[in-house]
């Protein structure tokens, strides 16, 4: 397990996890979403899942792939090689939402295992390394997400690295995947304008009042007109809370099944 001193060395100064778990467990969740984490190998996908589970209070310590002690990579072969081979499932509550995350293999040799998971997702989080940018396998993943019509959000990881350039990375995402890739910092007028340009309804709302309703954004995400982008560092637990809150606000959730009933 990772001790507190190691977390501090990585720049993580978190509030008490038991308190956070209590805060997110008090209320009964109003909705449930199933999220798949997909990425090219070494983008930091498993570290992101580790951060989500830690911040939501589901695990007491953040493991590391290079230490071989992550929660979801629990097969010996995975820990020895430092890669995910089998898809794994975990659940946590954040705000008013119960979230199931599926951590999928990033290595191209195990793409079939990853693709098998796509059909059950409400939304995908495509993890992109700020160091490597969009890779060939990232493009392959994007095409699969498009083929299965899966609403997609993007988390640009490793922003703590010196060579990471937010503006260049966002420009690359737009060039490769379209103008629907929008950074979800709505404090920025430029970001609000970029979001408004993705959909006529959002543009009308923005022009009439200067703001866009969250439900309107959620519909645009479901229709794959908008691909919300967040930037952070999974290793240092930076940007993860914003991503999780964004999932709660904008990720479409499956319609609940009607209660079964029959006359005998």
What do the predicted segments below correspond to?
Residues 9-264:
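Structural and coupling elements of P-loop NTPases
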Residues 1-4:
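Short, small-residue-biased leader/transition segments that mark boundaries at the very start
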């Amino acid at each position: 397990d990772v001790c507190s001193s190691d977390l501090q060395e990585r720049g993580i100064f978190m509030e008490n996890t038991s308190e956070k778990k209590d805060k997110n467990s008090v209320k009964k969740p109003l909705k449930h979403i199933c999220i798949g984490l997909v990425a090219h190998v070494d983008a930091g996908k498993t570290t992101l899942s580790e951060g989500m589970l830690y911040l939501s209070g589901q695990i007491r310590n953040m493991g590391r792939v290079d230490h071989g002690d992550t929660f979801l990579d629990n097969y010996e072969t995975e820990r020895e090689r430092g890669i995910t081979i089998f898809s794994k499932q975990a659940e946590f509550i954040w705000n008013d939402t119960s979230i199931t995350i599926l951590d999928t293999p990033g290595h191209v040799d195990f793409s079939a295992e990853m693709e098998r998971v796509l059909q059950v997702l409400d939304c995908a989080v495509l993890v992109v390394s700020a160091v490597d940018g969009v890779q060939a396998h990232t493009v392959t993943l994007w095409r699969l997400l498009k083929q299965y019509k899966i609403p997609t959000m993007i988390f640009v990881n490793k922003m703590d690295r010196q060579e990471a350039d937010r503006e260049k990375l966002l420009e690359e995402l737009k060039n490769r995947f379209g103008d629907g890739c929008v950074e979800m910092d709505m404090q920025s007028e430029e970001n609000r304008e970029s979001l408004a340009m993705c959909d006529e309804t959002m543009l009308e709302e923005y022009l009439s009042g200067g703001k866009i309703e969250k439900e309107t954004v959620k519909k645009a995400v479901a229709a794959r007109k908008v691909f919300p982008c967040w930037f952070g560092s999974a290793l240092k637990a930076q940007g993860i809370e914003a991503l999780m809150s964004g999932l709660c606000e904008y990720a479409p959730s499956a319609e609940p099944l009607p209660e079964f009933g029959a006359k005998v």
